[in-house]
């Protein structure tokens, strides 16, 4: 078991402890560290020496910048601290009332492409023999991005193609429809990009960190939990600003110029606050009951709970 995953196993089994950890790990200043510093921090927490308070910075650097499954340094733009600075503006832009279909599809394409790349980088690759991306996986990602881009632009497509001019119907397309659509597309994005894990399975470990074998049940559970957490992130980000506008409707009727800035700021604020919450819903060191895995793995497992790298 990798040192990062072992760290999550020992300290991240409660929601509040994970939330406190993620608040520290999402610090953008961690992006300034070099690969050598990251590898040094990872080797430090993997040593047999007991860590003290002075090593907290090394723990945060390792958990935020190296892969919990392999220990490899994550690409700069796909590290958790970079998620808000990069995807935040894309989320705000994708939820804007667009003037045409092309603008809506452009921002959806950027957002869905980044989310697909983020999910792929943070996948569980324990059963992959080749380090290069396969043609099947590449085609799956291209198809996922294409489909979610078109589906994400559906509200604007309805408005333009059906020539919707009625204010209630425009409100339905621009304020109500994006809520379930954002959650569903975020769920679908993770589910399809990481579909291979459900077919080939992922490595599971016993309570002592020893490898037990490869489990498809654990792979399905890992992908499902990650997809659900991403749906919560984007669904909440879409619904809260709309509720805010609804509650302050009378205020915005008197101050119409303030509605757009308040909406954009609330989207960015809710998205930023929900990132550590969604990342904390399930531990990166996922658990599964021994009875839930394949029969051939149950005999060689010690303890009632098995662990695996869930991904992000």
PLM-predicted stretches and their roles:
Residues 1-96, 101-104, 269, 273, ...:
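Intrinsically disordered, low-complexity N-proximal targeting/linker segments that flank membranes
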Residues 88-96, 153-164, 241-255:
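Juxtamembrane "helix exit" motif at the C-terminal ends of alpha-helical transmembrane segments
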Residues 78-83, 103-108, 132-148, 169-182, ...:
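Transmembrane alpha-helices of multi-pass eukaryotic membrane proteins
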Residues 125-134, 164-168, 204-219:
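Membrane-interface interhelical loops and short amphipathic "cap" helices
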Residues 189-287:
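Long, repeat-rich segments with strong aromatic
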Residues 99-163:
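Long, hydrophobic, well-ordered secondary-structure blocks that form the structural core
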Residues 140-211:
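Eukaryotic endomembrane system proteins
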């Amino acid at each position: 078991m990798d040192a990062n995953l072992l760290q999550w196993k020992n300290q991240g089994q409660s929601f509040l402890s994970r939330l406190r950890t993620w608040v520290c790990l999402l610090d953008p200043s961690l992006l300034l560290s070099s690969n050598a510093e990251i590898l040094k921090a990872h080797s430090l927490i993997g040593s047999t020496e007991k860590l003290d308070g002075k090593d907290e910075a090394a723990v945060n650097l390792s958990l935020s910048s190296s892969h919990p499954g392999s220990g490899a340094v994550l690409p700069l733009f796909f590290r958790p601290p970079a998620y808000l600075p990069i995807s935040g503006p894309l989320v705000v832009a994708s939820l804007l009332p667009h003037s045409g279909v092309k603008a809506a599809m452009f921002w959806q394409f950027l957002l869905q492409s980044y989310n697909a790349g983020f999910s792929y980088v943070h996948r569980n690759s324990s059963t992959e023999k080749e380090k290069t991306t396969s043609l099947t996986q590449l085609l799956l990602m291209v198809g996922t991005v294409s489909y979610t881009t078109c589906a994400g632009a559906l509200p604007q497509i309805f408005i333009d193609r059906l020539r919707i001019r009625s204010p209630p119907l425009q409100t339905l397309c621009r304020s109500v429809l994006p809520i379930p659509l954002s959650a569903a597309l975020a769920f679908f994005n993770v589910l399809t990009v990481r579909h291979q894990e459900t077919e080939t399975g992922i490595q599971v470990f016993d309570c002592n960190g020893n490898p037990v074998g490869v489990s498809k049940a654990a792979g399905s559970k890992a992908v499902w939990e990650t997809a659900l957490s991403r749906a919560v992130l984007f669904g909440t980000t879409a619904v809260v600003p709309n509720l805010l506008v609804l509650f302050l409707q009378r205020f915005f009727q008197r101050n119409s110029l303030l509605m757009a800035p308040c909406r954009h700021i609330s989207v960015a604020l809710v998205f930023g606050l929900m990132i550590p919450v969604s990342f904390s819903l399930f531990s990166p060191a996922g658990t599964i009951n021994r009875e839930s895995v394949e029969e051939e793995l149950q005999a060689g497992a010690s303890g009632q709970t098995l662990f695996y790298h869930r991904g992000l």
